[in-house]
């Protein structure tokens, strides 16, 4: 039960309170004064509650959170505490800790190497240590689900599949934890380890949307997968018929097309047509068709999910306006039918309480103060928060003012873009000189090299970089110089280069013919020069912002890193689950070789499984790639994802474990190399296309902006904002907020 009356009830209660106050105002004396003080106190509490509700709704809109939570004063305080930075940090830390336990639990990953020939575990945790840490994390998660359930209420809890699943996962993990302790940590299969990635998944709304889109996309691509399976079946049957008389031993072991094609082509020219047709249809037609379908289907489902986020933002902003209108109607003592405007001062009070970025807050407050009237309409209130979608253009400090005309002209010259172009040209010339020196000394032993050319060139260019830095500080001032990220990058590298050059001069003196001193101090001359050359190569990156297309690619890359967090999180979940399952299925299945320190483990292995045939696991020396612990399993899965060596692992685990182990590797191939890689390509395309379109927009073309594009911003042009009627209807269906039903 809520401790405060709901909004609809407060409106009627306030009218009764106002009527009672008017009756008592006719009387005089201390009783009348106390009544007015009591009414004033109640009014102040209501106004504070409305402002608090509006601030929370706006914060929900900024973070794309639902507003269907409790709105009484106590619940709002709990709500803001739950979403505070400290509370979320504790929750995220608990998720990180419980995921990291897999590295320390049996089988422990605390060994110098995962190589089967030399692997020796340094330390195994005693029973109860990791379980105790896990219990603390589970208790935090239980508190988390209890707080969420209370804030949403029972009705919303029943509608939330994620909260129900969260509760079930916690219950299963707790039961499995109790079973582990009762068996003294000796059980082989721990179900809760497979369930742990769910805690990471449910903590991110964007990750949940991406997962939902993945789940809905998979059935759509089954037709292409069936076509791909039919393609494999058809060509397998043709190969069995075609190569029946040709005794080709490698055909039963190799699966890479080119390795099969070359020996077959040496026997008969026509055999190459089979392999060309197989790779052309499978690799270039069906796989690219699969990429297109995954991109199209996932983009459609992601659009629908992002549409929900846009509705949440609009609903939060409109909900804040509606509760502020109730506050205004209570002040005037009128019914809710006149809730059309909000006082500007009230809006400013709300904005001061909202937790948001300082740049956006300052701009929104500036826009609110610019209103000519004292009242803000719903449309104006919504327009205020359009600033959240706009680029925040960085304002630079003013240039220093010089009184002498000569200094003013110098300032104009050295603050021009021409100085940047000259600087880029000088860095390019410096790189050419370094390249010439490296080519010249490539075949010369270090003891016979002459450092005169490199020393003179590097010293001269470092002096130029210092001069360029000083002139920019003169033109822009120290604050203006430091306000540009490119200047900070150049200045830092220039200072490091100057320190290296000075240390070289102090230790080895000035460059001269035949300059090749011995080692003195921490670095030799050649190591100092090599480090300086590496920094100069990094300094050449300053050219990126000055080339439009290159800058576009670079900014797309940085935005991609930010927006990939949700999709990378899903990949982490997949890695975690497959690694745990791999450890359960394949731990200690592959024996170490006979001449290793762990050779005693091979005593019970059939000699038929041991082979040094070319291209096998044993012959290639893949001993570090195994599933004997969690860390080794992660690395093995990564190798399978990025390296085309599937046949090696399919062969070895079919021999030592079971032929059915191939299903595990095929499933990982579908998840990693087919689905996730194609989603990665789709996100790159969306990000780059959106950046390309914006790069030709006339606004902000010549200004440096502090804009980081989110996934919602990427798809904003393809989304529709809800109508006012739709928003009001959704607000009236709020389980804890009862607005008046008067006309707007």
Model segments located where?
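Cytoplasm-facing ends of alpha-helical transmembrane segments in multi-pass membrane proteins
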Residues: 139-148, 183-207, 466-472, 530-550
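Cytoplasmic-side transmembrane-helix entry/capping segments in multi-pass membrane proteins
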Residues: 159-168, 483-492
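C-terminal ends of transmembrane helices
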Residues: 145-158, 469-482
């Amino acid at each position: 039960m809520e401790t405060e009356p709901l909004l609809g009830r407060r409106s009627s209660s306030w009218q009764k309170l106002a009527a009672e106050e008017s009756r008592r105002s006719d009387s005089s004396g201390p009783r009348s004064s106390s009544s007015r003080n009591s009414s004033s106190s109640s009014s102040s509490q209501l106004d504070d509650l409305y402002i608090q509700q509006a601030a929370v709704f706006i914060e929900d809109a900024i973070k794309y959170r639902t507003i269907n939570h409790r709105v009484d004063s106590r619940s709002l305080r709990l709500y803001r505490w739950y979403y505070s930075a400290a509370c979320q940090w504790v929750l995220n830390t608990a998720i990180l800790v419980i995921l990291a336990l897999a590295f320390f639990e049996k089988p422990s990953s605390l060994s110098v190497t995962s190589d089967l020939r030399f692997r020796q575990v340094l330390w195994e945790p005693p029973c109860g240590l990791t379980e105790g840490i896990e219990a603390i994390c589970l208790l935090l998660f239980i508190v988390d689900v209890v707080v969420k359930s209370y804030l949403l209420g029972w009705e919303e809890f029943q509608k939330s599949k994620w909260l129900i699943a969260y509760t079930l996962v916690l219950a299963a993990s707790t039961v499995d934890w109790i079973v582990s302790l009762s068996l003294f940590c000796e059980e082989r299969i721990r179900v809760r380890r497979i369930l742990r990635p769910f805690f990471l998944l449910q903590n991110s709304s964007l990750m949940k949307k991406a997962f939902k889109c993945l789940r809905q996309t998979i059935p759509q691509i089954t037709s292409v997968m069936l076509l791909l399976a039919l393609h494999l079946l058809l060509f397998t049957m043709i190969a069995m018929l075609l190569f029946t008389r040709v005794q080709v031993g490698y055909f039963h072991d190799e699966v890479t097309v080119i390795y099969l094609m070359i020996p077959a082509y040496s026997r008969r020219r026509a055999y190459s047509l089979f392999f060309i047709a197989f790779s052309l249809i499978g690799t270039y037609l069906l796989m690219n068709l699969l990429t297109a379908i995954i991109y199209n289907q996932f983009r459609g489902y992601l659009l629908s999910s992002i549409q929900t986020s846009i509705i949440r933002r609009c609903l939060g902003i409109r909900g804040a306006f509606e509760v502020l209108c109730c506050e205004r109607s209570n002040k005037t003592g009128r019914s809710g039918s006149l809730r059309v405007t909000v006082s500007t001062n009230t809006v400013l009070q709300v904005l001061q309480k909202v937790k948001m970025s300082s740049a956006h807050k300052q701009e929104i407050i500036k826009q609110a103060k610019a209103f000519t009237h004292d009242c803000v309409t719903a449309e104006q209130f919504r327009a205020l928060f359009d600033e959240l979608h706009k680029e925040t253009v960085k304002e630079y400090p003013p240039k220093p003012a010089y009184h002498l005309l000569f200094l003013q002209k110098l300032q104009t010259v050295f603050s021009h873009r021409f100085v940047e172009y000259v600087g880029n040209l000088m860095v390019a010339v410096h790189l050419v000189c370094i390249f010439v020196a490296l080519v010249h000394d490539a075949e010369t032993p270090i003891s016979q090299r002459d450092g005169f050319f490199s020393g003179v060139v590097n010293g001269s260019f470092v002096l130029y970089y210092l001069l360029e830095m000083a002139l920019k500080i003169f033109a822009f001032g120290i604050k203006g110089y430091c306000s540009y990220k490119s200047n900070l990058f150049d200045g830092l590298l220039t200072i490091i280069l100057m320190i290296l050059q000075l240390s070289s001069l102090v230790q080895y003196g000035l460059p001269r013919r035949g300059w090749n001193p011995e080692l003195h101090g921490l670095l030799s001359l050649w190591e100092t020069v090599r480090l300086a050359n590496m920094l100069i190569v990094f300094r050449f990156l300053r050219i990126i912002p000055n080339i439009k297309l290159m800058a576009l690619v670079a900014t797309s890359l940085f935005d991609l890193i930010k927006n990939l967090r949700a999709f990378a999180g899903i990949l982490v979940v997949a890695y975690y689950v497959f690694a745990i399952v791999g450890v359960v299925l394949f731990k200690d299945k592959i024996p170490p070789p006979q001449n290793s320190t762990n050779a005693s483990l091979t005593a019970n292995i059939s000699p038929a499984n041991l082979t040094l045939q070319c291209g096998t696991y044993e012959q290639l020396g893949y001993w570090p790639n195994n599933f004997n612990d969690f860390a080794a399993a992660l690395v093995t899965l990564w190798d399978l994802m990025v390296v085309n060596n599937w046949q090696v692992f399919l062969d070895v685990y079919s021999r030592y474990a079971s032929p059915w182990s191939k299903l595990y590797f095929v499933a990982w191939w579908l998840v990693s190399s087919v689905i996730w890689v194609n989603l990665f390509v789709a996100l790159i395309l969306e990000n780059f296309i959106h950046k390309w379109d914006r790069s030709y927009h006339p606004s902000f073309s010549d200004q440096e902006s502090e804009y980081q594009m989110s996934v919602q911003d990427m798809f904003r042009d393809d989304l529709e904002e809800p109508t006012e009627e739709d928003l009001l209807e959704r607000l009236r269906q709020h389980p804890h907020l009862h607005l008046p039903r008067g006309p707007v």
